[in-house]
Each structure stands twice: as C-alpha cells, then as structure tokens.
C-alpha cells in the first residue's frame, strides 16, 4: 500500500542517508477505507501484539472467569471469542484473538492454569479459514 515506502525508511541506516535526498512514492490507489482494519490487524500481528489461539475450555461454571482472572494481564484485550464447535459435553474449543505485549508470559499462564491451547498464525492452513 502507499505506506510501504515510508515504512521502509525505518530500515535504512541513518548515517548512510544523512545529507541525501530521499524520495518516497505514495500511491495507495489499490486501497480504500474498508481495508484499513485489515491493514491495522496485519500490522499488530507483525509487531507481535496480536495473537490467535484455539483454547480448550472445560464446560463448567466459571471457566471463562478463571481464564480472564488467571491468564489475562492488566493490558491484555480479547478481540475475538468464538466457539468453533460443540461436539463434546466436557470441553469446547474456542477461537480467541488477543492483543497483548507479553505473548510468552500469556502462554506460560495458560499452561499453569491447565488450558490446552494451540497458537495459530498465518502459516497454519486453518488460519485463513478461522481468521
């Protein structure tokens, strides 16, 4: 998109381009306002701030509360919470989208609280189907 050339400036060596004229070509003609949420989400994923998991929740009272209190941090945000399929009376798989700065800490808390989970990313075949 049009922001690509400007974003690339961050990767240039500042000393190497000092006192030189740098030109960034902005177009963005293939973009419209409807694509901005997608672009913002891809940026958050690239920066490691947004993650998707399939988490197995026990079908018993207060399981979601346990997840929120014991797993999520103060600055974590649930951006998506969707039951995938209810085939088992005891457990249900949930697609959970999270914005967090501390992904490794979050995964450790999931393990400590006995949640079975799988992180899914753009390389997983199921990613485009679910996300």
Where are these regions (language model features)?
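A conserved regulatory-domain signal marking ACT and ACT-like small-molecule sensing domains
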Residues: 33-131
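Thiamine diphosphate
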Residues: 9, 30-31
């Amino acid at each position: 998109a049009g922001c690509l050339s400007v974003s690339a400036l961050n990767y240039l060596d500042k000393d190497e381009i000092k006192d030189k004229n740098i030109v960034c070509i902005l177009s963005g003609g293939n973009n419209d306002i409807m694509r901005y949420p997608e672009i913002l989400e891809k940026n958050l994923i690239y920066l490691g701030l947004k993650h998707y998991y399939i988490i197995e929740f026990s079908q018993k009272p207060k399981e979601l509360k346990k997840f929120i209190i014991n797993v999520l941090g103060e600055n974590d945000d649930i951006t998506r919470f969707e039951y995938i399929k209810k085939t088992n009376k005891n457990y249900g798989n949930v697609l959970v989208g999270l914005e967090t700065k501390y992904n490794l800490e979050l995964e450790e808390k999931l393990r400590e609280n006995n949640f079975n989970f799988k992180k899914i990313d753009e390389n997983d075949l199921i990613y485009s189907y679910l996300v």
